[in-house]
A protein has these predicted regions:
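Hydrophobic/aromatic residues positioned on beta-strands within the core alpha/beta folds
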Residues: 85-86
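Non-catalytic signal-transmission and effector/linker regions of two-component phosphorelay proteins
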Residues: 1-11, 17, 40, 75, ...
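Alpha4 helix (beta4-alpha4-beta5 surface) of REC/receiver domains from two-component response regulators
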Residues: 67-68, 89-106
Length: 132
C-alpha cells in the first residue's frame, strides 16, 4: 500500500469459481482484489503490480500447488503477506510451509469469512515474515 487512503491489494489464487466469486463479493468492500485460477496465472500478475497479501489455496490445477506458488512469490514480492488455505491439516505440510515460504498464516477449510477477514487484517498489521 502506498497511500493510507488506498485499500490493501490482495491476490486471490483460487480455482473454484463460485468460491472465488463469493470471496470477492465479501472481501471486496475492504480489499482491492485481483484473482487468478492457477499458479502460472498468479505469477504473471505478480509482474504487473505490488500486492499486500497473497491468499492462496493449496490444491490447484497444473503442476504448481499453493506452496510452490508462494515460494516463487516470496522471491518476487517478499513484502507481501502470504496466507495459505488448505482442505486438510497435515503437520508435515504446515512445517514445510512455515519454514520454506514464511507464511503469515495457514487456515484449514472450511474457513468462516470473518475468520478469514481477521486473519488478513492481522497479517497486514505486521511486516511479512522475514521482513523488517
Amino acid at each position: 500500500m502506498t497511500d493510507a487512503s488506498q485499500r490493501p491489494v490482495l491476490l486471490l489464487l483460487e480455482d473454484e469459481s463460485q468460491l472465488k466469486a463469493a470471496l470477492c463479493d465479501t472481501l471486496g468492500d475492504e480489499f482491492e482484489i485481483e484473482t487468478a485460477t492457477s499458479a502460472e496465472e498468479a505469477l504473471l500478475l505478480l509482474g504487473t503490480r505490488k500486492f499486500d497479501v497473497l491468499l492462496c489455496d493449496q490444491m490447484l490445477p497444473g503442476k504448481r500447488q499453493g506452496l510452490d506458488f508462494l515460494g516463487e512469490a516470496m522471491l518476487q514480492q517478499p513484502q507481501a503477506r502470504r496466507i495459505l488455505v488448505t482442505g486438510y491439516l497435515n503437520p508435515e505440510l504446515l512445517a514445510r510451509s512455515t519454514s520454506l515460504v514464511q507464511l503469515s498464516a495457514c487456515l484449514v477449510k472450511p474457513v468462516e469469512i470473518e475468520q478469514l477477514r481477521q486473519t488478513i487484517r492481522d497479517a497486514l498489521a505486521h511486516p511479512a515474515p522475514g521482513q523488517s
